[in-house]
Amino acid sequence: MDEEFENDFPYKVMLNQQQDPSDAQSSPTFVPSANPSLTTPWLQTTPSANRPTWLPLQQHMHQLRHTGLLPAVESSFVHGHRRSASAGVGMGNFSNQATIPSNSPAVSNMQPPTQGGQPLYPTNFFTTSVSASSDSFPNSPTVPSKFSLNPSVATSTNISPRRHAKSHSVASVSSPNSHNAVPFTPHAFVPPVNNASPLPALNTLPQLLRPRNLDAQWRPSSLSQTNSPTHAANPSFPGTIVTHNTSNFRPEGGGHRHRRSTGSLSVGSSGSGFSSGGSGNPRKNLFSPYLPQSSIPALLAERRLVTGILIVSKKNRSDAFVSVDGLDAEVFICGSKDRNRALEGDVVAIELLDVDEVWAGKLEKEENRRRKDPISTRGSFDNLRIDAVPFEVPQRSAIKARDDEQVEGQTLFLLDQKQLGADEKPKYAGHVVAVLQRAPGQVFSGTLGILRPSSAANKERQTSSGNQGSSNNSGNDKPKIVWFKPSDKRVPLIAIPTEQAPTDFLGNDQAYAQRLFLASIKRWPVTSLHPFGMLVGELGSMDSMSAQVSALLHDTGVHSEPWEGSAATSAVTALNALSDNFLNVAGCADYRSEDVFLFVKNDVSKAAVSEVKQHESNINSSSATDFVSSAFHIRPTSTGYHVGIHVTDVSRVIEPGSPLDRELQRRSIAVNLCQKSVPLFPTTLGEALSLREDKDCYTMSLLLDVSSTGKIRGTWIGWAVIRPRKAYTMKEADELLQTDARLRLFHTVSSRLRTHHLGTDVPLSRYCRLVRRWDEESCSFDPNETNLFISSAVEVLRETLLDAANRAVASHLRQEFRENAFLRTQRLPSRENCRILQSMAIQMGCVLDLSSTKSLLRSLSLIEDDTVRNILQLYYYKVTPRAVYEMQKYKGNLASQMMSLGIEDESDDLTHFTAPLERYGDIVVHYQLQLLLRGELASEKRLRVWSQAANDASRRLVISKFAQETSIHIKIFSDWAESQVWQDGLVCFVAPSYFDVFFPSLGMEKRVHLDLLNLTHVRFEEDQGILSLYDESGAVTVVKLLTSVKVKLFVQLSTPPLINVSNVEF
């Protein structure tokens, strides 16, 4: 296999397929270094006497990146039904297997289009002004879709003899051959295909649609496909949900709770529902086999299936939800059987079911569970009365109380978790019929146990009651497996072979109760309730903060492994090219005479920089300093100000599509935690690209012509070379803000830009740091400041200039690239959440303007009370979906749903441009600007790669933000002292069964459940947001927003650590 694809971006599935010569893109000649030190050795795990030598972690993750992890997607037909591949050979080990149909996704290379058209910009820069031309960047030629399913390829579906809930197609279907099939797009509907277009023969189909040879090595795809033809069109949804039986495949009758097949879309199976497993002992299928991968595109085209990313509820792990583009509500997945072995974050194919039958089954199951729990007899959370009549305090079951303690205790904020009550029937329901994509190399942290948690609890109860049970299994019987309990409760228990456990584990398992291990899933057959996996390594004791941080990085999927292979070689080549061509200022504007300054997080001395340069031979040097992406210069003019924002030019040395570029796309973002940072770039290359004091630097520069009132009258973008004269640390700049002439001018211009943008002049102290939508992941994160509600004045001013630069670049991209522009957008909060936010504001004595994001920020900034402002921005932050990248062309009609609260003018367009050393999204924007400066067109293939990068980078930004907040929570736990047991807080949200408390000193929020308090009755007045608490003495305590409370907190060692409420005083 070609080296370029052998080390390709791992969120793709590449089979034994050679690159088409026409696909080759121009790239510099890479000269491999002969220095053996450039090759990073595998991370070795030191063996010890009491545990075996496991596969080294980095080697294991490298192998996972090149082997399959989709659960039981390999299949064969045995005894009349489709059997899991678990009998015999596990996932990722397909030796000596026959060529059989497969569910594994594959990717085919796209043919690049022939580019045409003349360059729009013959020079190396372009300018805009108020009267700028509206000439648009012409759309790149579109490749006609050649990926259609031959009608002779029949869908493997049979009428199931089992009863099944009524399933729904998404549009009326007259017959299975009524539409031509097209490949699927993750979490999107596939649009109708032109029936007049010819269909290719079977041998011309991409491997995505063909049976796959299991002898071939392959890699799983990610949550999206980089070169997949499935991005040929991102569909709008023209059809409607059909609520009647329209398919001749659909079985008669319902019975959602009793089916053992995929219903109307079942694969061929016998009526027995048992698998021999290759051993002669039949085992019952606990899950439905996945549909053949080759049948998925046709079913999507016929509106028989929908696709999306699976999200498992943290509050109730039996529930899951799939967000589908084109549907006005999420699809509800009820229970583990309907989830069908899919994991959090998987791209899944969903068949819609009858909502009434699914919901009735869920309510019946909840009622049965409630009857078994005597604690729940005093009250129910599902039928709370919210009028002015006192009602009995609802009691949580022991299981729910424990789940609440774990979910609410490990987060900094109480994020809006999906949880359905008895009166919240979903609009759509469905079940998983195939896992289409899964992030490769997933490794989970957790603990080991001999018994499953449920079995251990039963044994403990038997022991406490004096019943030791049967002793037949005690003594010489050695268990074949031990159980791995993941830290993330959404991940199922994993069965691990006993041989992989520490040698003394069976005889001394309690000694390992507080030890953190790493494990991965190898396979999950349909006959097993739990997946089978393997131990990867041991992190250490749970009370070690370094082990906690390592567990956090693994559980969130942060790529912290060293650079190796062709990506590391490509990084060295880029570093050498940067050194050899420095300084080639041809075509660059020279701003070395300008008074350029920059800001750094830490005090980066010249000695530290020199130390880094001594390690340039090692691409993974640990002597890293803070990378600086942006610098500024400001000069007064006769009518205003000349402002320059200079951003390091990464596109100068990174070739799109190179191994370095693909590895940067895989990592997507630098992760900044309180305890450590995981950079996006290799240390030496990042240091070479970083802007430094008294160093000549290549930049992509943006010049702003700013009026005296803060209005931007014109912009210029082009390549430049600068030499910063001064580097301020953030602490130093705060101290000199009013005395340093350079910083005073910086303060004046930034303040006027902010005043003009918001339409009002507000103090810097009222800056709403938490709800800024352009930098949610906080690349400027300060590990010493854990309160996210506090910002320094210099940081606010700096971000104002960067925000102006991002909006100016977004305006250029929108004008030139139109629907191909790489922009940052945000979904609307739900109407109900907007109503609650406005109601909260009114109860606290203010009114918010929710007509647009800008107007909301303006309203929040006008609130003088810090506490009220922080509570409102906290709630808005929790209920607003995270901002994402998008290219409108590949989003269909989703774009209209993805804008912010509203757009007041074109300047509200946003993108990421100013931090290319921290975010891959900024690198894509630099690529697009490079095309504009060169007057070139982007190929359709390259645009699809960028659309894929938008999906991946958006997901990674959310992960980075969650990791940041969790690291703050871990730091608060590690610094905990007995004096912090009682904390002063303010009520920030009120509900019938709980109220939330905000702690201003910690910047943290916790929940107080009413069943923790000694109460007899409660009364909730929803219209006024008042909760009245009645205790046994008859006293009444009124709780509403801004009520001062004193809360007793307690900490508990877990992964992540827990901080919860034990008592409250009013």
From Swiss-Prot:
Q: Where, per the database record, does this protein carry Phosphothreonine? A: T157, T262, T377
**Compositionally biased, Polar residues: which spans?**
29-40
Which compartments does it reside in? Cytoplasm
Query: Domain CSD2 spans what residues?
Result: 482-556
This entry's Gene Ontology molecular function terms read: 3'-5'-RNA exonuclease activity; RNA binding
| Residue stretches making up the DIS3L2 C-terminal domain | 983-1033
Q: Any idea where the RNB domain is?
A: 618-934
Keyword S-adenosyl-L-methionine among record annotations:
no
Q: Name one Pfam family in it.
A: Dis3l2_C_term
Please provide, in alphabetical order, the Gene Ontology terms of the cellular component aspect for this entry. cell division site; cytoplasm; cytosol; P-body
Q: Which residues carry this modification: Phosphoserine?
A: S264
Q: Its GO biological process terms?
A: mRNA catabolic process; nuclear-transcribed mRNA catabolic process
**What segment(s) does the record annotate as region Disordered?**
18-40, 154-178, 247-286, 454-480
Q: Which UniProt keywords apply?
A: Cell cycle, Cytoplasm, Exonuclease, Hydrolase, Nuclease, Phosphoprotein
Name the predominant localization: cytoplasm
Query: Could you tell me where the Gly residues compositional bias lies?
Result: 270-280
Q: Which InterPro entries match?
A: Dis3_CSD2, Dis3l2-like_C, NA-bd_OB-fold, RNase_II/R, RNR_Ribonuclease
Sequence ranges of Low complexity compositional bias: 18-28, 168-178, 464-476
Q: Which family does it belong to?
A: Belongs to the RNR ribonuclease family.
The protein's job, in short, is: Required for the maintenance of cell shape during interphase. Required for localization of cortical actin to the growing tips before mitosis.
What's the subunit arrangement here?
Answer: Interacts with serine/threonine phosphatase ppe1, protein kinase C and an osmosensing MAP kinase.
Q: Under what name is this protein listed?
A: Protein sts5
Species source reads Schizosaccharomyces pombe (strain 972 / ATCC 24843)
Question: Lineage of the source organism?
Answer: Eukaryota, Fungi, Dikarya, Ascomycota, Taphrinomycotina
